[in-house]
From Swiss-Prot:
Coiled coil: none annotated. GO terms for molecular function: asparaginyl-tRNA synthase (glutamine-hydrolyzing) activity; ATP binding; glutaminyl-tRNA synthase (glutamine-hydrolyzing) activity. Keywords: ATP-binding, Ligase, Nucleotide-binding, Protein biosynthesis. The keyword Nucleotide-binding applies. This is Aspartyl/glutamyl-tRNA(Asn/Gln) amidotransferase subunit C. GO terms for biological process: glutaminyl-tRNAGln biosynthesis via transamidation; regulation of translational fidelity; translation. It comes from Gluconobacter oxydans (strain 621H). It catalyses: L-glutamyl-tRNA(Gln) + L-glutamine + ATP + H2O = L-glutaminyl-tRNA(Gln) + L-glutamate + ADP + phosphate + H(+); L-aspartyl-tRNA(Asn) + L-glutamine + ATP + H2O = L-asparaginyl-tRNA(Asn) + L-glutamate + ADP + phosphate + 2 H(+). Its EC number is 6.3.5.-. Signal peptide: none annotated. It is an enzyme of class 6 (ligase). Allows the formation of correctly charged Asn-tRNA(Asn) or Gln-tRNA(Gln) through the transamidation of misacylated Asp-tRNA(Asn) or Glu-tRNA(Gln) in organisms which lack either or both of asparaginyl-tRNA or glutaminyl-tRNA synthetases. The reaction takes place in the presence of glutamine and ATP through an activated phospho-Asp-tRNA(Asn) or phospho-Glu-tRNA(Gln). NCBIfam families: gatC (TIGR00135). Heterotrimer of A, B and C subunits.
């Protein structure tokens, strides 16, 4: 299956993806093959198979929570449009 140029362009616009005209045909074929694959999955007999949202076997590795200053204050402050010492300077919004 291959999607027509109008459909590909519409999907790209909805996804906010900029496409060059020469990409439309290739992308249409790629999207079509994905749709064909999903159609094949619909044909699989899953009778008697319980729905599953995860294996439940894997335990996530957690790191120890430690509060740090990041050790990069000067690097962060270098992005400030204005600063006074080690602080950002922002316009006054409340009088």
């Amino acid at each position: 299956m291959s999607l027509d140029a109008k459909t590909v362009t519409r999907i790209a616009r909805l996804a906010r993806i900029g496409l060059q005209p020469e990409e439309i045909e290739t992308l249409g074929k790629d999207m079509g093959s994905i749709i064909d694959w999903v159609e094949q999955l619909k044909e699989v007999d899953v009778t008697g198979v319980d729905p599953m949202i995860g294996t439940g076997l894997a335990k996530p590795r957690l790191r120890e929570d430690r509060v740090t200053d990041g050790n990069c204050r000067d690097k962060v402050l270098s992005n400030a449009p204005e600063r006074e010492g080690p602080f950002y300077t922002v316009p006054k919004v409340v009088e």
